[in-house]
Amino acid sequence: MKDNPISLFHELESYVRGSKDTLHRYMYACILEQRLADLLLLSRCGVHPDDEDRLAVRLASQRSLCVQAASDLAEGTEEARGSTPAWPDCKVTKSSAAQKRPELLSLVKVMQELRTPECSGYDLCDLEVCREDALHWLRDHADPSSPPVLIGVRTGGAFYAPLWSSALQQRWGNKALYHTVRALRMPSDPGASLYLPEELSILPAAIEPDTDIVILEDQPHTGGTVLELAGRLSAKYRLNKPVWVSSPGRLFQIENGRLAKCSDRIPLNTGTRKRIWQMLGNSEEVAEFLLPKLGLTDAHPADLEAVPYKSVPQWNDPMYRREVPFRINPKKTPFYIRRKSTNEPVVFAKFIGKDLFGDFQFHQLKKFEKYFPDILAYQDGYVMTKYEPGLKEMREMFVNMPSAVTREICQSVSGYWKTLLDSCQISGGHPVHPLADHWQARLGEMEDFIGRKLPYDLDWFERSLHTEWTSSAHVYTSLPYANQYGHWKARLSAGQRLKTYRFHIDSTWGGTSSIEVELASFLLENRVRPDDFRLLVNQVKKEAGSLTIEAVTDALPIACVLQAANLLKQAKDESRLSKELILSEAMQSFEYLQAMKPKLSDVR
């Protein structure tokens, strides 16, 4: 998994180097701690060549840096101190990990991704409250004579544990250390958590009988992740007292194999001004706050209102903390700013994450400005763009427009993948696409849902889904969540000037994908003709030397299964797509693929 010099992670390192923001530096330090801890785990499992002792020393040093950065953050230090450590490369591929230790596949996948923790994406908190959580635990729930063993569960817990350690060092100095462990997924049961003995053995060999253990984790859902870890720790240390669990603002104890809530408070800093996502539901407040930032010189506050793109569920309001599970989740709450007098939308606002993750995402997004409406502002994790009325779906244009127009579309959108390769490339991608294991089950579920058999070539799909993409360029992208044709639009002006748009470029909730699958998804969703297929692939090939038309053709069935999986998801979530719409879309896609298959031999 050797990192490309232009990889996403080196882009992140460069961005943080240019920032003096203490929160940016703190979160990057925690991301780096996770990277080093994962590398040490791979080394101890015999699949990474780096020296264990050297990695262990560097990891201990990095954790000290995390605690210092946590103290700076909690104390309100205005400007970050010290240098930004370099991003450590990794020389492990998924195929080599699979051959030696199949259970490490999920770890290598995690290491390819810039995962947004819940605290920055969809269970928002102000991180500094975690330090107050630790002091609250000391004051109201425990009076230990020795420092507790602090264990953060990577990913989320790695951002909380240093803040606890920083608080506890006020009493115990450098003895208040912390550790992190990675919860992996069992190959035989993806819903179950797995902690490897090679990592648990790094924890203290023994502890005093009255020592407390505190596990730091994102908000527990079922509690399965922390309950499994607590069980392993109880066996390791022969515990005679309950294990504590903390997520931002919350404290639990494990009693009789269950999580019992001890305290709960809204995890927001009361000294911080109100953010947009705290104003949701109050249209006038949102509009009045944003107007000075949007450059709408002809608008008056009384004539503007904020209108949810979707309904704003009450559980997004901090006052509804009693709801379970509770989240402050702006991911679900895009909105328009609209003129009351004309009902005309003028601004569209979408949340892309807060703190370092949102800020870096916005930094990346600006590289794609050519494919965006005009960006008016970025505030509190929301990107606000000029509302663009009258856009046409690109699919409609590929189907109905003359070849001169569709060729121009292909020329225009090819630059999107160039920018993606330049800014979001990762290394060591998937030898076989993740959908390969269960693709027939997914299509079977779709057939059951629509009550029809899908027309597809079983051999072609089986060969495609098990293609090894080891020589491909891989990117971190929004594709797994935003591959529908509705994300691609265009406008042809009266003077025949073409402007193309790609919506939902942000990969805050994204994943890894090969460039072949990226292109195949675009071609399938937009019903691209064979000649345009060839033109687009050859344009992108200029930036991705290993790309071939044959490989993109081989990826088309993957795009079809990916679309089916997303349609099924939308049938179940809040959007609740109708059965009739899903039937129409699925059948058209599979029929398009069947009709295209004999023509693709000419494209090759």
From Swiss-Prot:
Catalytic activity: neamine + 5-phospho-alpha-D-ribose 1-diphosphate = 5''-phosphoribostamycin + diphosphate
pH and activity: Optimum pH is 7.5.
Keyword line: Antibiotic biosynthesis, Glycosyltransferase, Transferase
Co-factor note (free text): Divalent metal ion.
Temperature dependence, free-text field: Optimum temperature is 27-32 degrees Celsius.
Pathway it works in: Antibiotic biosynthesis; butirosin biosynthesis
Keyword Glycosyltransferase included in the entry's annotation: yes
Task of the protein: Catalyzes phosphoribosylation of neamine using 5-phosphoribosyl-1-diphosphate (PRPP) as a phosphoribosyl donor to generate 5''-phosphoribostamycin in the biosynthetic pathway of butirosin.
Protein name: Neamine phosphoribosyltransferase
InterPro entries registered for this protein in UniProt: PRTase-like
Record-listed E.C. numbers: 2.4.2.49
Keyword Transferase in annotation: yes
GO molecular function, a single term: pentosyltransferase activity
UniProt organism field: Niallia circulans (Bacillus circulans)
Biological-process GO terms, alphabetical: antibiotic biosynthetic process
Cofactor(s) recorded in Swiss-Prot or TrEMBL: a divalent metal cation
